Amino acid sequence: MIIKINNKRNKIAKEIRDIFQASYTIEAEMLKAIDFPPLKRTISQFLNSNSEFYAYYLNQNIAGVIEINNNQDLTHIQSLVVYPRYFRKGIGRKLVQFMLDTYKSRIFTVETGLDNHPAIKLYKSFDFQEQHQWDTNH
């Protein structure tokens, strides 16, 4: 089940941060990133975020979260995270499909690491197309 969650509540903000830490730790290792900004996000930053957060619940527990920034013309996937124990179970795919079905923007965007092959494969399966590559010091 996918539902919108209220990141302005302390308990929810902590749950969001916990899943971000678990998922982005794996991505940082995959990308060989030493300094990885998603891992630096604080509970306070989640509490104060204007993004929209949706959670995929499995057995009454959050298994995945998608963070969306939306305006009329553009919807951006700010983050898509899944607890590592639920990797390769289709949760990320269901969250992306939910976002595409829910938002009626003309343009959908996402950014991911060049070496994050599972994420790239997922986004390409929804016809996302690479537009740019950036070199970072992460």
Enumerate the predicted regions with their spans.
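A short beta-loop-alpha structural element at the N-terminal edge
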Residues: M1-D18
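Conserved acetyl-CoA-binding loop-helix of GNAT-fold acetyltransferases
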Residues: V82, R88-D101, K121-S125
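Short glycine/proline-centered loop/turn elements that form peptide/ligand docking sites
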Residues: G92, V96, D115-A119, T136-H138
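Conserved GNAT acetyl-CoA-binding A-motif
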Residues: V96, T102-L114
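A short helix-loop-beta-strand connector motif used in the catalytic cores of GNAT acetyltransferases and
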Residues: S44-A55, H76
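Conserved GNAT-fold acetyl-CoA-binding loop/helix
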Residues: Q21-Q45
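Conserved beta-strand in the GNAT
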Residues: A55, N61-N69, H76-V81
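Conserved catalytic-core motifs of GNAT/GCN5-like acyltransferases
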Residues: T109-T112, Q129-H138
